[in-house]
């Protein structure tokens, strides 16, 4: 065990015994850790350990079991995420995705920063689907998946239009469409936007407008990539998918 200070983002918590809780926190310095909080309801920092909060932790880090929190300060609460069920669903999904992407205790400050920035953008009102798509695509390599959407897999032509081939795990230009008769037959704009989302920095992201029809095509394609190359099935993703018809009902 060692005492340390680190930034930490609360992923989730669950009850443990009658009055205690286990709180999973993605720390900047020590990766994802499970913290034991005794008498959670009476804890002076219980409100700082809710979902969608980030803060500075003073803690005892244990590599072989539960870690322990001494204090939480400089707390940031993503209030808009907590208040809006649709933003909340997208945030919950990317948190689950980050949790699945690396092992517990694995040091990954880049992923911590990427997740934190994604939540900040969601909280600031950036397009939920766009932020989520960017996160999904840029976290793929942590699942061991490396896909190139910027050029033809055969001739390396970098000017589209392109289609995607699962057979070759890459893009095809029109000259090489015949190499895979079962290619995806995508709208060329899907590949263009997928490549953009895979490469863009969240710090460069500006508020953009994408039509619902195009968003649906992108969603379907990314789902296909995850089914083919990753193979995880998260409850948060299933819940998010089930919300597709809610917007019209709640108007």
UniProtKB/Swiss-Prot annotation:
Keywords from the UniProt entry: DNA damage, DNA recombination, DNA repair
Family: Belongs to the RecO family.
Name used for this protein in its record: DNA repair protein RecO
GO-annotated biological processes: DNA recombination; double-strand break repair
InterPro entries (UniProt xref): ARFGAP/RecO, DNA_rep/recomb_RecO_N, NA-bd_OB-fold, RecO, RecO_C
A Pfam family recorded for this sequence: RecO_N
Listed GO CC annotations: bacterial nucleoid
Presence of keyword DNA damage: yes
SUPFAM superfamilies assigned to the protein according to its UniProt record, in alphabetical order: ArfGap/RecO-like zinc finger (SSF57863), Nucleic acid-binding proteins (SSF50249)
Function: Involved in DNA repair and RecF pathway recombination.
